[in-house]
Amino acid sequence: QDWFHGRCVTVPRLLSSQRPGFTSSPLLAWWEWDTKFLCPLCMRSRRPRLETILALLVALQRLPVRLPEGEALQCLTERAISWQGRARQVLASEEVTALLGRLAELRQRLQAESKPEESLAYSSDAGEGAGHIPKVQGLLENGDSVTSPEKVATEEGSGKRDLELLSSLLPQLTGPVLEL
């Protein structure tokens, strides 16, 4: 069971009689609740920055008394700083930079392969009647193309090649495995 601050999270409206027009079902599904599952004051983005905490620790060291909360804060801050250092060290290692470079090459190659197909799609659609709306293939922010179900069937071979190439690079990764 999850616990939230009572003042931060609203109680769900469970009876459908409170909703106009929906009298057929007695209860609402969980995705229809008018609730927040994370307390807004406890969300990660509201946590203080490390610089702010370090300034607080410096101010705490000037006090003539020792506070257990200050010592706990210092311990947590040291852990965070050491974790950041280890993460930077791993990300700067030759193995990770080589793999990131290889992934960038693969992304560029995939984008280069998709560009001629897009130009063909534009030119073939342009010759059709004025009443026909051309199907334009969009691009996502990261540059990946949005494909239609028809194109997925034609590109299965290249997708399998890329998957095999990426899976061959997986054994080179070192460190603990995180399950998402």
Curated annotation (Swiss-Prot):
Its main location: nucleus. It comes from Cricetulus griseus (Chinese hamster). Gene3D superfamilies: Zinc/RING finger domain, C3HC4 (zinc finger). GO terms for biological process: negative regulation of DNA-templated transcription; rhythmic process. The keyword Oxidoreductase applies. InterPro entries: Znf_RING/FYVE/PHD. This is Lysine-specific demethylase 5C. Histone demethylase that specifically demethylates 'Lys-4' of histone H3, thereby playing a central role in histone code. Does not demethylate histone H3 'Lys-9', H3 'Lys-27', H3 'Lys-36', H3 'Lys-79' or H4 'Lys-20'. Demethylates trimethylated and dimethylated but not monomethylated H3 'Lys-4'. Participates in transcriptional repression of neuronal genes by recruiting histone deacetylases and REST at neuron-restrictive silencer elements. Represses the CLOCK-BMAL1 heterodimer-mediated transcriptional activation of the core clock component PER2.
